[in-house]
C-alpha cells in the first residue's frame, strides 16, 4: 500500500525499549525465527543459515512536539549514523565483548547499551519521517486540514512509525552510541546493581564517560574488535531535509535518500534546538554534559514557562492529529508557535541562555573587540534556532540563510550587535584618550625646552641676550626636535623623549646665553650640565652622537675680513656666538685631563706635521702668492726627537654652503658677513693649517712665530684621510672638523692682510709635504666620553687644567682672552671654531666671498683687546729651550696667465 511520508519535528524525551536490534528478513524486513542452525521468516517464508542472519535496528522513543506527546518507533538503517555501526556489526561487537570480558554477561551488556542509547538520543531534536500519521489520527492523508484534533484518541499518547530520522541541521554534532558504549563496557565494575539501571544517567557518570570518550587512548579499541566493521565516534553529517514533489513521494519503494535529494533545501530544517553545539569557549565536555543529562535537569526543575520569544527557541510542531506535506509551500503550519508545556525544554533553553549570556557577554566586556574573528567564532559555535516561522516564509530571508546561521543561539541580532558596537565605541574612546595623552606629552616636552633655555649661569655677570639669538634658537629647537619628538612619542618612549629634549635644549640655552662678546668667561657650570643627563649612559650616548660630526684637530688660522658697518658686525657676532655656544655645556673653564696624553700619543708614529700650499690669483700681474705656514703640535715637545720624521695629513672634506643655527651635532653652511674675526687657535691633539689666499703686494713680514703650546684633550681623536691631490672647486674649500670638550687658548696676530674684492676666485692646488719626505696617515682614535669624564679636574675659580707630569712643562692653561682680531676677506663659518665646548661644531664649509681692500680694526666694535702675538707669548708662557725652531712664512711668486 502506497503511503505518503509526513515529517514531524520533535524532541526526544526518553527511550522506551531496551532491545534495539532484532534479526530481520532480508526480503520483507520482518522479524525471523532463529533455530539452532537455521532461521525462518514467518511472513514471507524465506529461510537460511544462522550464520547469515541479518539484524536491523528498532528504536522506540518518546517525543514531544509542542504540547503533544508521541511514541515513535524508528526502524531500519537510518539509525546506523547515530549508532556508529550497522545493527549486524553491533550484535557481533556485543558478543565479542561478552567473550573477552569475563565480568560481563548479557544482562549487564544490555543495560550498558541502554545507557549509551539514552545518552546519545535523549535531549536531541530530530525530523522524523512518519509513515502512519493519517491512519492513527483517523483523517484522510490527503486532507489539508492538519490542525484538526483527533477525536478518537483525545487525551491518549499516539504511536507513530518512522522510517527516517534526519538531523535538523548539518551543523549539529554528537557522539555515537558505540562511542558511549565502549568506555562503559571497559569500565571497572562497582558494587551495587543500581549502576546498571537506566537511572545511572547522572551528571557524574556523564562527566566520567565523556572524559573516557575524549581520551586519546580510546581509539584503539575499534581496531581490536573482530567485527571488521567501520566504526564512527561522531555522527556523520547527514543530508539536509529537502522538499520534493508529491508525485515523487507517492511510491513507497522510492528510497528516502533519493527523496531528500530530489529538490532544493528549505530553511525550515534549520529551526532546531542545536543542543550539542558548543555554545561558548568552554570545553566540549561541559556543553555536551548540560545537553545529554536532560533527565536530571527535568527532575530538578519543575517550573514551567513558555518557549516563545522570551527564550528565543522555536516550537515548530503541530497540534494534535495534524501533519505537514513535502509539497506544501508552508512546511509547518501557522500555529507552530504554540509554546511547549513540557518543563524539560524550558530547563534546556534556560541552561543554554544562561551559558551564553553569562560567559560570552563577559568575554566581550573584558577583551579587546575584534569584530570579524568574533563573528566567525560565533558562527562556528552556534546554529540558527531562534528564527520564527513567519520569518522563514519570507523568500528574501530564505535566500540568505547563511547570515542567519551566524546568529547566536539565545541572543537576538539587535542585542548581539549592540554588545559589539558598544565595545567598538569604548575602543575608539580609548584611542582618543591615548592620542590626547600623546599631545600632552609633546606639549610638556616643548615646555621643557623653554625651561631649559632659562638655565642660570654660574658667573654673576649679567648676560644680555639679543632678540635675534632668541629667535634663532627657538627656530633651531622647532626644526631639529619637532619631528624626532613626535615620532618617539608615537613609539611610546616618553622617558627617551624627555632625555633627548633635554640634551637638545641645553644647546639652545647655551646658544642664547652666548650672544655677548665676553662669552669666553661665561660658561655653563659643570653642575648644570651634569643635571641635564640623568646617568653616565645618557652622557655617553649624547656625546657619541656629537662626536660623529667631526674629529679634533689643532690648527692655526690666518684670515682677514673687512668691516663695512656696525650692523654687519652685530649680525656676525650673533651668528658667531650662536654657533660657538653649542659647544659650552660641559663646563665653565673646561676640564682637561692630560693623564692619557702619554698613553695615546707616546708613539713616535703619531706625531706629524702638515704643510699646505694654496694659491691665490692676483688681479694686477697675474701672479700667485703662496703662503706657507708650518705648525708644530704639543706632542713634539713631549716626545722624542725621532717623532719629527713623520708628517701628519689632515682630512679635507667638502661641505654645504649654508650656515644655519641648529641643535644637532653637525653645523654646516656659510654666511655673507662684512666682518669676521680670526685668531690663532690652540686645539687639543692635532694640528691643522688653514691656508689663506693673500695678494703679493700686501704680504706681511715673515717673522711670524708659528710654534705654540697646546692643551691636550683626552676624549677626542682624529680619523686620518689622505688629502685629495686633484684640483678643488674654486668656489668652495673644505677644512678639517674640530671638536673640543674644554676651554682652549687663543693667540692672535696683530698683522692683517687685505685683499682685493674684485679679484676673481681661481682654482688652487693643495700639496702636502712631510719632513724627510715621509708621510703617514694618522690612525683614528676614539675614546669613551664616559671613561674619563670624572677624571677631569677643573678649578671653578681659575679655570686652569691639571696636567700630568709628562706634559706639564710645556703646557700652560689660561683664560681665553682673544687679542687682536682683524678684518678678514674670507667668510668662513669655522673661523670661530676655537670656542671650547663638549660638542663638536659643524662641518667646516664656507663659500668663498669676494674680498675687499679696506683695512679696518674691529677690536672696538667687538669689545676685544688687541695684543700682539709676541706680547701674548711673553705673558703666558716662555718657550722651552729645546723647542723646535720656528719656520717662517715663505713668499713664493708664480706667474700665471688667467
UniProtKB/Swiss-Prot annotation:
Region (Disordered): 191-210, 643-670, 710-749
Localization: Cytoplasm; Nucleus
Gene Ontology cellular component list: cytoplasm; nucleus
Low complexity bias locations: 726-741
Tissues where the protein occurs: Highly expressed in the testis, spleen and heart. Expressed at high levels in the primary spermatocytes and to a lesser extent in the round spermatids. Also found in the bone marrow, brain, lung, kidney and liver.
Lineage: superkingdom: Eukaryota
Record flagged with keyword Protease: no
UniProt keyword annotation of Ribonucleoprotein present: no
Main location: cytoplasm
Pfam families reported for this sequence: Rep_fac-A_C
Alphabetical UniProt keywords: Apoptosis, Cell cycle, Cytoplasm, Growth arrest, Nucleus
Conditions for induction: Strongly induced by a wide range of stress signals: nitric-oxide, gamma- and UV irradiation, hydrogen peroxide, adriamycin and cytokines and this induction is dependent on p53/TP53. Expression is low in resting cells and increases almost 50-fold as the cells progress through the S phase.
UniProt biased composition (Polar residues): 643-664, 710-725
Biological-process GO terms, alphabetical: cellular response to cytokine stimulus; cellular response to gamma radiation; cellular response to hydroperoxide; cellular response to UV; DNA damage response; fibroblast apoptotic process; hemopoiesis; negative regulation of fibroblast apoptotic process
Described purpose of this protein according to its UniProt entry: May be an anti-apoptotic protein involved in DNA repair or cell survival.
Protein name: DNA damage-induced apoptosis suppressor protein
Organism the protein comes from: Mus musculus
Gene that this sequence comes from: Ddias
Amino acid at each position: 500500500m502506497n503511503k505518503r511520508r509526513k515529517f514531524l519535528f520533535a524532541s526526544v524525551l526518553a527511550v522506551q525499549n531496551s532491545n534495539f536490534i532484532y534479526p530481520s528478513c532480508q526480503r520483507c524486513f520482518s522479524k525471523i525465527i532463529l533455530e539452532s542452525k537455521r532461521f525462518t521468516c514467518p511472513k514471507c517464508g524465506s529461510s537460511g543459515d544462522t550464520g547469515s542472519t541479518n539484524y536491523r535496528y528498532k528504536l522506540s522513543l518518546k517525543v514531544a512536539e509542542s504540547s503533544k506527546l508521541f511514541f515513535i518507533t524508528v526502524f531500519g538503517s537510518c539509525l546506523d549514523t547515530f549508532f556508529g555501526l550497522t545493527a549486524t556489526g553491533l550484535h557481533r561487537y556485543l558478543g565479542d565483548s561478552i567473550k573477552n570480558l569475563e565480568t560481563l554477561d548479557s544482562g549487564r551488556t544490555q543495560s550498558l547499551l541502554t545507557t549509551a542509547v539514552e545518552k546519545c538520543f535523549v535531549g536531541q531534536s530530530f525530523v522524523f519521517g512518519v509513515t502512519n500519521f493519517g491512519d492513527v489520527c483517523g483523517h484522510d492523508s490527503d486532507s489539508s486540514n492538519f490542525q484538526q484534533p483527533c477525536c478518537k484518541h483525545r487525551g491518549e499518547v499516539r504511536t507513530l512509525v518512522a522510517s527516517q530520522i534526519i538531523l535538523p541541521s548539518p551543523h549539529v554534532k554528537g557522539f555515537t552510541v558505540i562511542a558511549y558504549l565502549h568506555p562503559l563496557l571497559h569500565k571497572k565494575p562497582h558494587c551495587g546493581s543500581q549502576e546498571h539501571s537506566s537511572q545511572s544517567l547522572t551528571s557524574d557518570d556523564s562527566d566520567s564517560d565523556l572524559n573516557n570518550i575524549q581520551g586519546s587512548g580510546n581509539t584503539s579499541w575499534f581496531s581490536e574488535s573482530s567485527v571488521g566493521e567501520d566504526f564512527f565516534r561522531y555522527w556523520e553529517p547527514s543530508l539536509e531535509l529537502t522538499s520534493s514533489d508529491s508525485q515523487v513521494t507517492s511510491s513507497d519503494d522510492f528510497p528516502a535518500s533519493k527523496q531528500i535529494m530530489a529538490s532544493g533545501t528549505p530553511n525550515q530544517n534549520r529551526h532546531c534546538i542545536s543542543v550539542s553545539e558548543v555554545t561558548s569557549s568552554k570545553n566540549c565536555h561541559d556543553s555536551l554534559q548540560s545537553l545529554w543529562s536532560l533527565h536530571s535537569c527535568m527532575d530538578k526543575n519543575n517550573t514551567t514557562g513558555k518557549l516563545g520569544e522570551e527564550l528565543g527557541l522555536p516550537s515548530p510542531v503541530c497540534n494534535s492529529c495534524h501533519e505537514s506535506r513535502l509539497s506544501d509551500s508552508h512546511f509547518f503550519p501557522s500555529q507552530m508557535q504554540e509554546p511547549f508545556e513540557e518543563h524539560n525544554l524550558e530547563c534546556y533553553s534556560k541552561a543554554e541562555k544562561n551559558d551564553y549570556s553569562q560567559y560570552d557577554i563577559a568575554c566581550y566586556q573584558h577583551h579587546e573587540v575584534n569584530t570579524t574573528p568574533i563573528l566567525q567564532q560565533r558562527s562556528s559555535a552556534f546554529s540558527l534556532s531562534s528564527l520564527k516561522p513567519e520569518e522563514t516564509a519570507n523568500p528574501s530571508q530564505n535566500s540568505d540563510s547563511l547570515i542567519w546561521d551566524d546568529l547566536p543561539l539565545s541572543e537576538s541580532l539587535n542585542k548581539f550587535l549592540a554588545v559589539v558596537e558598544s565595545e567598538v565605541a569604548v575602543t575608539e574612546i580609548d584611542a582618543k584618550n591615548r592620542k590626547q595623552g600623546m599631545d600632552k606629552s609633546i606639549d610638556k616636552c616643548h615646555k621643557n625646552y623653554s625651561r631649559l633655555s632659562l638655565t642660570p649661569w654660574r658667573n654673576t655677570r649679567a648676560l644680555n641676550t639679543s632678540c635675534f639669538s632668541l629667535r634663532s634658537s627657538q627656530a633651531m629647537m622647532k626644526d631639529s626636535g619637532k619631528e624626532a619628538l613626535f615620532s618617539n612619542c608615537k613609539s611610546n618612549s616618553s622617558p627617551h623623549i624627555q632625555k633627548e629634549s633635554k640634551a637638545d635644549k641645553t644647546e639652545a640655552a647655551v646658544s642664547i646665553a652666548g650672544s655677548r662678546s665676553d662669552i669666553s668667561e661665561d660658561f655653563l657650570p659643570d653642575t648644570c650640565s651634569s643635571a641635564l643627563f640623568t646617568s653616565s649612559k645618557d652622557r655617553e650616548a649624547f656625546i657619541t652622537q656629537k662626536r660623529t660630526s667631526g674629529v679634533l684637530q689643532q690648527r692655526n688660522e690666518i684670515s682677514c675680513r673687512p668691516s663695512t658697518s656696525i650692523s654687519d658686525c652685530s649680525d656676525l657676532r650673533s651668528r658667531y656666538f650662536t654657533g660657538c655656544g653649542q659647544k659650552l655645556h660641559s663646563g665653565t673653564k673646561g676640564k682637561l685631563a692630560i693623564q692619557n696624553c702619554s698613553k695615546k700619543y707616546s708613539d713616535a708614529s703619531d706625531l706629524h706635521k702638515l704643510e699646505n700650499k694654496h694659491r691665490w690669483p692676483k688681479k694686477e700681474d697675474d701672479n700667485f702668492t703662496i703662503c706657507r705656514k708650518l705648525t708644530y703640535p704639543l706632542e713634539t715637545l713631549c716626545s722624542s726627537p725621532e717623532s719629527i720624521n713623520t708628517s701628519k695629513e689632515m682630512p679635507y672634506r667638502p661641505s654645504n654652503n649654508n650656515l644655519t643655527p641648529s641643535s644637532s651635532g653637525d653645523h654646516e653652511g656659510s654666511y655673507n658677513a662684512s666682518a669676521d674675526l680670526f685668531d690663532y687657535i690652540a686645539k687639543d691633539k692635532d694640528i691643522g693649517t688653514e691656508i689663506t689666499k693673500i695678494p703679493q703686494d700686501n704680504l706681511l713680514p715673515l717673522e711670524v712665530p708659528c710654534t705654540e703650546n697646546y692643551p691636550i684633550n683626552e676624549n677626542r681623536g682624529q680619523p686620518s684621510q689622505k688629502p685629495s691631490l686633484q684640483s678643488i672647486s674654486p668656489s668652495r674649500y673644505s677644512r678639517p672638523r674640530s671638536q673640543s670638550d674644554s676651554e682652549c687658548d687663543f693667540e692672535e696676530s696683530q698683522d692683517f692682510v687685505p685683499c682685493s674684492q674684485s679679484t676673481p676666485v681661481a682654482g688652487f692646488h693643495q700639496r702636502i709635504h712631510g719632513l724627510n719626505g715621509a708621510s703617514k696617515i694618522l690612525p683614528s682614535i676614539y675614546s669613551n666620553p664616559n671613561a674619563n669624564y670624572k677624571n677631569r679636574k677643573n678649578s671653578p675659580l681659575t679655570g686652569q687644567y691639571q696636567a700630568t707630569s709628562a706634559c706639564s712643562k710645556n703646557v700652560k692653561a689660561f683664560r681665553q682672552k682673544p687679542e687682536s682680531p682683524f678684518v678678514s676677506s674670507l667668510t668662513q663659518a669655522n673661523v670661530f671654531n676655537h670656542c671650547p665646548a663638549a660638542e663638536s661644531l659643524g662641518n667646516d664649509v664656507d663659500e668663498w666671498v669676494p674680498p675687499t681692500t679696506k683695512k679696518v680694526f674691529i677690536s672696538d666694535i667687538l669689545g676685544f683687546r688687541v695684543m700682539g702675538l709676541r706680547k701674548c707669548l711673553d705673558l703666558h708662557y716662555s718657550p722651552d729651550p729645546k723647542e723646535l725652531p720656528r719656520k717662517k712664512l715663505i713668499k713664493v711668486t708664480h706667474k700665471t696667465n688667467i
